[in-house]
Amino acid sequence: MKRRIVAVLLLVAMMLSMLAACGGQTPNQGETPNQGETPNQGGETVQTVGNFAVPEGGYDGSEVTIRFYNTMGANLREVLDLYIVEFNKLYPNIHIEASQVGNYDDVREQIATEITVGNQPNIAYCYPDHVALYNIAKAVTTLDGLIESDIEVTRADGTTEILGLTDEQKADFIEGYYNEGKQFGDGLMYTLPMSKSTEVLYYNKTFFDENGLTVPTTWDELEAVCAKIKEIDPNAIPLGYDSEANWFITMTEQYGAPYTSATGDHFLFNNDTNKEFVKRFREWYKKGYLTTQEIYGSYTSGLFVSTEEVKSYMSIGSSAGATHQRPKMVDGVYPFEVGIATIPQVDASNPKVISQGPSLCILQGGKTSDQQVVASWLFVKYLTTNMAFQTEFSSTSGYMPVLESAQQEENYAAWLAKADGYSFLTA
């Protein structure tokens, strides 16, 4: 069981066919900036970073304050604070002010408002639709030149690093996660991945084993399993799916059906293929096979862990929310064991799952100085390329690290090896 869970989580993290996280890909509304070398007002040559010019010498060691908006709870903030201390040993004059701003939607709405008065943070958790919204005001710094910069920066301990990413650092990112940063229609890089999750199928392994049920790998198989579950337990709602939006996006990708486009006609989802699978799922709902968060009125994990008369035996939700899919102990014993599998597919030989979890973007404009942008980049680079931070943050949050090396790191592998269907479901 342990090996199976580990294999599933690593498989979904490594799939090449990853989707953009919640919401369609909206094109950048700003013009594609020129790149190359341009003189600054003093006649010096600077490296151009899309719409941002890297100052000659990169970070000059000046005192700067960086505001970082995120959604971290107390446990993750503790991890972040530890690594801010480590970062400040290298860059003592870069002061990080990290703020939890509700959920992802709250972050987006607050920043969208603050952009209008030029008071946006320097770094923010983001999803692709956030970046597209901010870019209406051309507020997101493109990272290409920063990534490619070979400017040497001297740190407080006397060591040096290049401002940009080394070839080894670039190659260490999981490719699908890294490429999410350049999906906005102009080929430029706007984000780096912070931590990621995907959707998985949680199932009541105890119930499945007792009734000889096979975990479905396709939607056809899922329909058949739902029918069998209704025969066994007529009061059951066999499947709960937390995110209707994710389901629709995932199905368009699995079918290879049009959804949105960064160029030409932007909205392509109203087509026969998509109508057909929506119609099919509606029939399942009418048969009592499924519910969703919108229909149920809450996360469907509540139905999955229920010990009441009406319950579900399968739940599709975030891999980072595994603890919410675990039932409460009764007299020191869990009512059932939870199994984890990849979500059903249209074609099991060509699996596709959605990529979720925050990336980091650097905001510019308003009162932001060039040194704040460069300092922000150094901190973003630190969080996203530091294997120790990535593994500790991931084991605390349940999200997957974005680095190949972190997934293979000894302590993280040992943590994953604890995985089971009970107390260590998070791993």
Model-inferred region functions:
Residues K89, H95-E97, V117, G187, ...:
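Extracytoplasmic/periplasmic substrate-recognition and gating elements
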Residues V54, G58, D144-D172, A257-E276, ...:
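Short, solvent-exposed loop/beta-turn-alpha elements that line the ligand-binding surface or hinge
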